[in-house]
Amino acid sequence: VIKEALGRREELTVAPAGGQGIPNNIFECIIGYDDLKDEIKFTLREGRKSHYLLIGPPATAKSLFLMELGHLRGAYPATGSRVSGAGLTDAFFNHQPKILILDEIDKIPMDATAVLLSVMESGDVLETKYKRQRGLKHDLVVFAAGNTDKTMPPELLSRFDTKLYFSPYSFEEFVSVCRGYLSRYENVPRVLAEYIGIETWQQLDKDVRTARGIARRLRENTTDDVNRVVRFLMKYAKVHE
């Protein structure tokens, strides 16, 4: 039935990065991981069908890789805890992304898992609705991240040919990442971006996203205003019992 719906079309390949405009300085704000940066760039530029799974605790480099990839043309971001099979299918038909950026894959529901299994292996996307069927042959690269792979179905885990496991940042790495990321994407002066990183590490939760949130709440680019935002976040921070 699936073959009849899709027809006998030849398998597509991901468009080379030259067509997608992969910048040479992508991942510039990520400290280290030069070998991984090179592998990802090669995959995209050469149009290779390869799926990457990034596993590690919150606020590690895996989050930054997804953020950087999400800026690329042709990328479609989704969150495992919020996506559904129907929503993912609609995204493939309506947007036909070349790159799927999937965070929290360890929380993805079963109906979305079924869609992923098919498109990651054969490129087949099939929808049956109101006794009508439509099919699509659509190959893409999947970059997914999660805190653990223990809750992932074995068949989904096996779809990823590149499984990478990340360790938490050190203090120096975290501050350096904040300096690079906030100055590049949030237009914060590098010295102030570094200060935000230090305060986030020492006063809050050591999460790059928290540092980004501080940068977006600034009313003026001063350390005093950073301190104001940090005090605000600390006031309403979760109390650990």
Language-model features and meaning:
Residues 15-51:
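Pre-Walker A (pre-P-loop) alpha-helix and adjacent loop at the N terminus of AAA/AAA+ ATPase modules
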Residues 45-78, 93:
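Walker A/P-loop
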Residues 153-187:
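Conserved AAA+ ATPase core "coupling" helix
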Residues 186-238:
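Conserved AAA+ ATPase small/helical "lid" subdomain
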Residues 73-99:
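Short glycine-rich substrate-engagement loop in P-loop NTPases that contacts/grips substrate
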Residues 62-68, 97-121, 150-160:
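Conserved AAA+/SF3 P-loop NTPase catalytic/coupling segment centered on the Walker-B
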Residues 113-135:
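Conserved catalytic/switch belt of AAA+ P-loop NTPases
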Residues 58, 95-96, 127-145:
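AAA+/SF3 P-loop NTPase mechanochemical coupling elements
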